[in-house]
């Protein structure tokens, strides 16, 4: 790596409460020569709050692939650059991937400056398992594509995290109910760190009803945390054992049939018995 090249700093900014900026982020803003931002007007207002004035470079979804090389050239000339998004951590459902990849390929040092991230902030307050999770960004805008995406994730056991917009939230919850079931537990985190912060959890059917009762509840930036599929013991029982259970239970009491099949196939008889209660007449 050329020591004369500049450094690209990936700097997280607040997601609502301006007090959540870090001292390190402010120090980096003072040091860099240029700030790359999604919306330069929005970011200019943000940084002016902290008394920081720096030149901006607009880098957003519509121009990143064409413009990233210009920033790489500036870095190679020795300029230091901070990359920020409109809110939160850059690259998390925000631009920056192409720039960071090009920098790493060019041997330019990339330094992350951690801070707020809406997905992780919502997850830690959701009460849903956080040891394994899957962040999927925004779901598709069209219902058909959205349902297809959700169907592909229907068997996912990890916690699912999505961002969603205010004008699609009710339709999205309806599609979640249709594809994942009315009883799937969902937490909605709205306006995190802001005045009207709301974090509410319920099964998706109840949550959709609650949101629909007051238009104000569907306003603001939203994160959806969906509990992963809870595997039932019967999910692991092979079809041959279940077929045997069905046949034997036609001539013997279900409890006896479950005991016989459990002995033959090595499954728990209680799991087999429960399956029979739920599926056999």
UniProtKB/Swiss-Prot annotation:
GO cellular component terms, alphabetically, are: cytoplasm
The UniProt record lists the EC number as 2.1.1.198
Please indicate if the UniProt record lists Metal-binding as a keyword: no
InterPro entries, from UniProt? 4pyrrol_Mease, 4pyrrol_Methylase_sf, 4pyrrole_Mease_sub1, 4pyrrole_Mease_sub2, rRNA_ssu_MeTfrase_I, RsmI_HTH, SAM_MeTrfase_RsmI_CS
Q: Where in the cell is it found?
A: Cytoplasm
Task: Please list the reactions this protein catalyses.
Answer: cytidine(1402) in 16S rRNA + S-adenosyl-L-methionine = 2'-O-methylcytidine(1402) in 16S rRNA + S-adenosyl-L-homocysteine + H(+)
Annotated keywords = Cytoplasm, Methyltransferase, rRNA processing, S-adenosyl-L-methionine, Transferase
Q: Name one GO molecular function term.
A: rRNA (cytosine-2'-O-)-methyltransferase activity
NCBIfam families registered for this protein in UniProt: 16S rRNA (cytidine(1402)-2'-O)-methyltransferase
Which family, according to UniProt?
A: Belongs to the methyltransferase superfamily. RsmI family.
Q: What does this protein do?
A: Catalyzes the 2'-O-methylation of the ribose of cytidine 1402 (C1402) in 16S rRNA.
Q: What is this protein called?
A: Ribosomal RNA small subunit methyltransferase I
């Amino acid at each position: 790596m050329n020591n004369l090249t500049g450094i690209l700093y990936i700097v997280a900014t607040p997601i609502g409460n301006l007090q959540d900026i870090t001292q390190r982020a402010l120090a980096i803003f003072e040091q860099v020569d240029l700030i790359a931002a999604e919306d330069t007007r929005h970011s200019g207002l943000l940084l002016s709050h902290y008394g920081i004035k720096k030149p901006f470079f607009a880098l957003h979804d519509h121009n990143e692939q064409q413009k990233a090389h210009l920033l790489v050239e500036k870095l190679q000339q020795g300029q230091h650059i901070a990359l920020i998004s409109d809110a939160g951590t850059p690259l998390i459902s925000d631009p920056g991937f192409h720039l960071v990849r090009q920098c790493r390929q060019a041997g330019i040092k990339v330094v992350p400056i951690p801070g707020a991230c809406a997905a992780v902030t919502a997850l830690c307050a959701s009460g849903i398992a956080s040891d394994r999770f899957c962040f999927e960004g925004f779901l598709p805008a069209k219902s058909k594509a959205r349902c297809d995406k959700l169907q592909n994730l229907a068997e996912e056991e990890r916690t699912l995290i999505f961002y969603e917009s205010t004008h699609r939230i009710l339709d999205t919850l309806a599609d979640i109910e249709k594809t994942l079931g009315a009883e799937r537990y969902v937490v909605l985190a709205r306006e995190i760190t802001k005045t009207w912060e709301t974090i509410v959890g319920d099964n998706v059917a109840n949550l959709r009803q609650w949101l629909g009762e007051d238009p104000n509840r569907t306003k603001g930036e939203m994160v959806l945390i969906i509990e992963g599929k809870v595997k039932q013991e019967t999910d692991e029982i092979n079809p041959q054992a279940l077929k045997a259970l069905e046949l034997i239970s036609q001539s013997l009491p279900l409890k006896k049939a479950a005991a016989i099949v459990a002995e033959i196939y090595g499954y728990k008889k209680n799991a087999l018995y429960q399956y029979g209660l739920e599926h056999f007449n």
